[in-house]
Amino acid sequence: MNIFGTDGVRGRANVYPMDPITVLRLGMAIGLEARKVGTQVVLGKDTRISGYMVESALVSGLVAMGVNVGLLGPMPTAAIATLVRNLRASMGVVISASHNSYLDNGVKIFDSEGIKIPLELEEVLESNVRAELSSDLAQVRGMGKVYRIAGAVGRYIEFVKGTFPKRLKLSGMKIVVDCANGAAYHIGGEVFWELGADVVVIGNKPDGLNINHNCGSLHPEGMVQKVLEEGADIGIALDGDADRVVVCDEKGRLVDGDQVIASIMRHLRATKSITDAAVTTMSSKSIDSYARELGVRLHRSEVGDRHLVDTMRRHSCSVGGEKSGHIILWEHSTTSDSLVAALQILSIMLLENKSASSIFGDFVPMPRVHRDIPYSMEFDHIARLIGPTLSDVEQALGRVNGRVIFRRSGTERLIRCVIEGEDPKLVALVADELSIKLRELGVENGVEPEMQ
């Protein structure tokens, strides 16, 4: 069974592959590769309770291979990608399961340039996790040391603020920030406050168990309510490792990643500073025509931050993102950074002198239903059983410029099912019929239906 998915290693904490023995061996495998480049690895994490175990196991493996480890503590994923470059480290490692609950944990790995490691290196690491590495252990004199990196939070805050136009301030703007009780709990509000905003922070009291629990980008209802209560100009919800952002406007209407990307594309195109952008297969079909109208070449990648970055690099894209809220601004970041993306949105509001609802109102996503379906039987077996029904669905949706996406998640045991088309009634009808068929086949019903 492969331990790497679409975004590093992820699974239930204390269960393979996130058990201490496997994580220790992963640390050794990472150390074996890192020492080919240098002697330092930086290591950050989010706030889930299992992070202590995972951190200890990884550190043991790394120092045993002769690698020094700089501990960052709770920090956003993008902060590690930034600091690995600034500190000239061999690799950066993040302990996080992103938007998953506290029950899970994971490991993401960045190279010395702050880019997620390629598939080929993942395969090497996977092989070495299973290999006998005792002969590769460092001599006692050459074992690594562990130290805490002082001032890392301040460094990252200054980096994020540096992506905001120097002539602008957030004075007079009221912002609600939901930090998801995650890695940005001590950073999210500080960034906007230091730039002059009146900030209302929620989801900033992590206890190791409440990360992403009824808060953050997956559960933005609290943010929406707080925006309406406070009369705020905008709401910004992060996830557990602050690599995705979900926004609501001053009217409490939610804005997804596609709308954020569309707004950024429109603004950058008006300044002639963008020719190419990238999204994944999960993005709305209507964003393609929107980009064409702007004169922007839009490229699509497979789902996942690494695939998106590969596409952006190949086509020299200025901006890229996923509907889920991962936004990459290549001028500033090598991975998705929710705080940098949020400042980009705020700068557009100020430069165009418009409200949040105005800057997002230009792009209308195609009607869709998105269902996350838990499953227990083998996915390939499910795909074979549901195949004829999917063919019928695709044929029906073809009449309304629609499509169906039926794929397994690379980070959770869920099937991602998306039905979209220009006729919302047909989309809803097809989604219901597909759900009925899945129940008949013994697959569990979808959870958290979303109609846009």
From Swiss-Prot:
CDD domains: GlmM (cd05802). GO terms for molecular function: magnesium ion binding; phosphoglucosamine mutase activity; phosphomannomutase activity. Binds 1 Mg(2+) ion per subunit. It comes from the Bacteria. Its cofactor is Mg(2+). The modification Phosphoserine is found at S98. Pfam families: PGM_PMM_I (PF02878), PGM_PMM_II (PF02879), PGM_PMM_III (PF02880), PGM_PMM_IV (PF00408). GO terms for cellular component: cytosol. It is an enzyme of class 5 (isomerase). Activated by phosphorylation. InterPro entries: A-D-PHexomutase_a/b/a-I (IPR005844), A-D-PHexomutase_a/b/a-I/II/III (IPR016055), A-D-PHexomutase_a/b/a-II (IPR005845), A-D-PHexomutase_a/b/a-III (IPR005846), A-D-PHexomutase_C (IPR005843), A-D-PHexomutase_C_sf (IPR036900), Alpha-D-phosphohexomutase_SF (IPR005841), GlmM_bact (IPR006352). The active site is at S98. Keywords: Isomerase, Magnesium, Metal-binding, Phosphoprotein. It catalyses: alpha-D-glucosamine 1-phosphate = D-glucosamine 6-phosphate. Its EC number is 5.4.2.10. GO terms for biological process: carbohydrate metabolic process; peptidoglycan biosynthetic process; UDP-N-acetylglucosamine biosynthetic process. Mg(2+) binds at S98, D239, D241, D243. Catalyzes the conversion of glucosamine-6-phosphate to glucosamine-1-phosphate. HAMAP family: GlmM_B (MF_01554_B). Belongs to the phosphohexose mutase family. This is Phosphoglucosamine mutase. It comes from Anaplasma marginale (strain St. Maries).
